[in-house]
Amino acid sequence: MISNKTKGIAKEIRDRFKADGISNRNISVVCRESKYDGRKVETIYVIVIIPNEALDAYAKPIVEEYSKRYTCDILNFMFLSSYLANKM
């Protein structure tokens, strides 16, 4: 069972992207629980589709901010350019 702390972090991240004007269909935030070396590990996967020209300027500061603020087990960000996403 995913902890309330991890769920709260995931919701905050989703709300941050929505506040920045990224539509709901371009954001995916998923929490998963697994076992690693006999202990429970919670992972948050964040996938965001944004315009290609905004990748460097937008993505890097957000990843740095959340990596410093939270010490959850694993926090994965994946930013896809809208050009690449349309080709998939």
How would you describe each model-predicted region?
Residues 48-88:
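C-terminal basic regulatory modules in eukaryotic proteins
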Residues 1-11:
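A short, highly charged nucleic-acid-interacting micro-segment common to nuclease
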Residues 14-55:
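Amphipathic, interaction-prone secondary-structure segments
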